[in-house]
Regions:
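Conserved NAD+-utilizing ADP-ribose enzyme module
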Residues: 2-8, 44-103, 107-209
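Gly/serine-rich nucleotide phosphate-binding loop at the start of the catalytic core
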Residues: 1-55
Length: 209
């Protein structure tokens, strides 16, 4: 996929997080789960568990004195044996390591709204950050990686579904709409952000930037 094809396919790029995530992003950039876990106030045993096992529920961390929430990875528990859907010799800890190394962005508003509605029902509010696809390409460079599937959901089919090459750089991804856009290692440059808003369950919206 060329940059021009990406821009044609992806008119919308956005990130959804718990209330307060925008303030954290303005201070520290888009941080990966791995980065947050490594910086959090945890015992070494707790840290290693979070780095290598899926999160059945959301996890609250204290990072540099700030309260940070890591989303649950509940859909991965749809199978009793996660390894049964992993290919290329991956085990569960390998897959979780791959997931934790990246920040995730929606590439269409429909799928974003589905997750937003889910967490509005649970938490009452969420922060939504909108980014320019063009500026995201420029800021992320080769660290921008795309997927053809939701990397934390499991389809109702047998055989391997999650492979080592699930995250493909732009140049290796075929010309089709990606399911997810991810950035390996996070993103400090916030120039792609053009709007941030706080959404509430009752329909109210608060413009943050």
């Amino acid at each position: 996929m060329t940059p021009e094809q990406f821009l044609h396919r992806c008119k919308v790029i956005c990130h959804v997080g718990p209330v307060g995530v925008w303030e954290q992003i303005t201070k520290h950039g888009f941080r990966t789960a791995e980065q947050l876990i490594l910086e959090a106030d945890l015992t070494e045993e707790e840290r290693q568990a979070l780095l290598s096992t899926p999160r059945r529920e959301s996890v609250r961390l204290s990072v540099r004195g700030d309260a940070v929430t890591l989303r649950d990875q509940g859909p991965l528990f749809a199978r009793k044996d996660l390894k049964s859907i992993l290919g290329d010799g991956l085990d569960a800890s390998d897959w979780i390591h791959l997931l934790n190394q990246r920040v995730y962005f929606f590439t269409d508003e429909t799928s974003m709204r589905k997750l937003l509605d889910k967490y509005l029902q649970i938490d009452g509010g969420q922060d939504v950050i909108w980014l320019s696809p063009l500026k995201l390409i420029e800021a992320a460079g080769l660290r921008l990686e795309l997927t053809s599937q939701n990397t934390v959901t499991i389809a109702r089919q047998s055989g391997a579904q999650k492979m080592a090459d699930a995250f493909a750089p732009l140049w290796r991804f075929t010309d089709r709409k990606p399911t997810e856009a991810t950035i390996l290692g996070g993103l400090d440059d916030l120039s792609p952000v053009f709007r941030a808003e706080r959404c509430f369950q009752d329909g109210r919206r608060q413009i943050l930037t």
